[in-house]
Amino acid sequence: MSAQAEFDAFLRFEARPLTPALGAELIGADLTRPDAQLFEEVHSALLQYKVVFFRDQSLDREQHIAFARGFGELEIHPATPADQPDPEVLRIAHGPKSRGSENNWHSDVTWRERPSLGSILRAIELPDNGGDTLFANMVVAYDRLSDAMKEKIDGLVAVHDIARVFAKRLGKAPED
């Protein structure tokens, strides 16, 4: 990236692109007091960069939910325990009793007819090493396909089925 393209200016923050294909750190945004202009600019940055990161935000659970609601109605993930006080927040923790399955390559809730815009992750405790979350820009991946491959796959439809992934968590055996 050239020195000129190091930061993209918005009115409420600066965006520092992280790679040519994906991601930007949004610097100077205060997520504890969002307003319509901040939501509009973050939404615009999200569409442009596909993944955005905010450092040094001191959001509590309620502020996290309020920020997320600024982008629309929140959905309750099927893996959320029924007795959780804030079902819109899915707690992901790893330790001796919880190994997790989200380290497998996935895209959140793609089985929905209209998947959500995205997920808003808030790291509370991170390990000294690891703890990485990986992202991919599928628009760039498609654009880089050959014309012959695009012609071959255009018009195809995929069926994403929740049953296999969540059958064990939901107390059911997956169907073959």
Regions found by a protein language model. Name each.
Residues 1-176:
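Non-heme Fe(II) oxygenase catalytic core, chiefly the N-lobe of the double-stranded beta-helix
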